[in-house]
Amino acid sequence: MESYKPVWLKGAVILAINLIDKGYKPVAVGLGERDFYIDVKSDTSITLDEVKKAINENVLANVPIENNQIVYKGNKVSIIEDKVSISTNLNPKYFEILNISTHHPNPNEQYVRIRGVAFETEEQLKDYLTWLEKAEETDHRLIGEKLDLFSFHEEAGSGLVLFHPKGQTIRNELIAFMREINDSMGYQEVYTSHVFKTDIWKISGHYTLYRDKLIVFNMEGDEYGVKPMNCPAHILIYKSKPRTYRDLPIRFSEFGHVYRWEKKGELYGLLRVRGFVQDDGHIFLREDQLMEEIKMLISKTVEVWHKFGFKDDDIKPYLSTRPDESIGSDELWEKATNALISALQESGLKFGIKEKEGAFYGPKIDFEIRDSLGRWWQLSTIQVDFNLPERFKLEYIDKDGIKKRPVMVHRAIYGSIDRFVAILLEHFKGKLPTWLSSVQVRVLPITDEVNEYAEKVLNDMRKRRIRAEIDYAGETLSKRIKNAYDQGVPYILIVGKKEASEGTVTVRARGNIEVRNVKFEKFLELLITEIAQRDVEQTTVKALK
């Protein structure tokens, strides 16, 4: 998606100017996850045909941009995008308007929102529309509703998700897996508040350089902020007592809730929200420990993505360098950047460069993952930071008794757990691996006469912490099987009189695979192993065939 965004933004600007020429009043253009949007004042009606006519109008070769606004014929149109710039080299000619709807940025305002895409060639447009049709079939928002995983409610607030029991089960499994990964690397888990005085954001630099994302309020004469990041809190834990060179590295982890005020037009299901949980981690270490730590993080990150079935070709690291707005000296930035480059080179991974896309306090390695639809998602990050230890005056006593500054490394493997849930739902098309599925087995008694045996099978699985449920014979067997498939249940156990008398089950798995006369204890043993190993494939049914 990211590679399309520059041409989409240019297309949105072109269309906005053409709409002005037609007498309409666009007020903003921006980018969504899969398209561009234009907000138009709704004091005059606008139809799809009128928008299509405006597409073909001539447009100025060089669009006048001032202070991130299109300035044209007395109109000022805000550009709601700070990561993609307007390119004079792009010339989109092929447009598709995806929909026109009413948009309410607040209760007192109403706009017409036009969503569309633009490309330089007709072939690119056709290919994208074909891909989009497939993507819409696996939209995580539809899957989430269908499987009863999560919901959004305007009365609760835009971009604030409510996870239902089945959705929370998936999150819990992801967190449990990451806890094991963290334990294997020597992390100590911490918990920090959701709200802090803004003093720490002023020290860290977030208050100035991250101000548009901060949610702040005043209480009893003090200014507080809902945390957008966990790092300053972890720094304060480090500072809570003296540290020596023998203590380092110190590794803190937290499944921390953070909140960032994303623009309403950019919110998109779980992929772009205002409140989410990070699998965050911060390491405080000596400079001589830095290289090995980064190499370990790179290795563990790749190991995690392999566990979810992503191959080496689906994993692409990038080095993101110093942005225009940053803190710290050139010397510190160069030192941090060189450390990341050296670790990447020693890892043997091929990596790209993203100029000026580092964090404001340090360079970083970002990992992008390619899903089953060919999309690349930025997930994991490893950031080297010499600046925040300096700003917070962090210290440790070296072996020679001298106080020195530690280096700080920020890291997250999933990134946002909520966003990762969305990516997994779309990647697996709602059919999650057994260990992640909110319901792992559904028992289907053929008739009420075998309910007692079906319930014994159910209870035996639940005693072994398998997430199982039963669907009694209220509907036909074929209908109940279809319901289980549609709801992404990995395994279906069918039991009738024969199975009840022999202590067996008929096992059905995804792909319409069926295995009869399976001893229930044998199935249970194999399933426990599949779940414990967190297999991506359904290894239980493979072993039974």
UniProtKB/Swiss-Prot annotation:
One of its GO terms (biological process) is threonyl-tRNA aminoacylation. Catalyzes the attachment of threonine to tRNA(Thr) in a two-step reaction: L-threonine is first activated by ATP to form Thr-AMP and then transferred to the acceptor end of tRNA(Thr). Also activates L-serine and transfers it to tRNA(Thr) but cannot deacylate incorrectly charged amino acid; unlike most archaea the editing function is found in a freestanding protein. This is Threonine--tRNA ligase catalytic subunit. The lineage of its organism: Archaea, Thermoproteota, Thermoprotei, Sulfolobales, Sulfolobaceae. Belongs to the class-II aminoacyl-tRNA synthetase family. GO terms for cellular component: cytoplasm. Binds 1 zinc ion per subunit. SUPFAM superfamilies: Class II aaRS ABD-related (SSF52954), Class II aaRS and biotin synthetases (SSF55681), ThrRS/AlaRS common domain (SSF55186). Residues 139-433 are annotated as: Catalytic. Zn(2+) binds at residues 231, 282, 410. The keyword Transport does not apply. Pfam families: HGTP_anticodon, tRNA-synt_2b. HAMAP family: Thr_tRNA_synth (MF_00184). Homodimer. Probably interacts with its editing subunit. Its EC number is 6.1.1.3. Gene3D superfamilies: Anticodon-binding domain, Bira Bifunctional Protein, Domain 2. Its cofactor is Zn(2+). Keywords: Aminoacyl-tRNA synthetase, ATP-binding, Cytoplasm, Ligase, Metal-binding, Nucleotide-binding, Protein biosynthesis, RNA-binding, tRNA-binding, Zinc. It catalyses: tRNA(Thr) + L-threonine + ATP = L-threonyl-tRNA(Thr) + AMP + diphosphate + H(+). It is an enzyme of class 6 (ligase). The gene is thrS-cat. The keyword Metal-binding applies. It is found in: Cytoplasm. GO terms for molecular function: ATP binding; metal ion binding; threonine-tRNA ligase activity; tRNA binding. It comes from Saccharolobus islandicus (strain M.16.4 / Kamchatka #3).
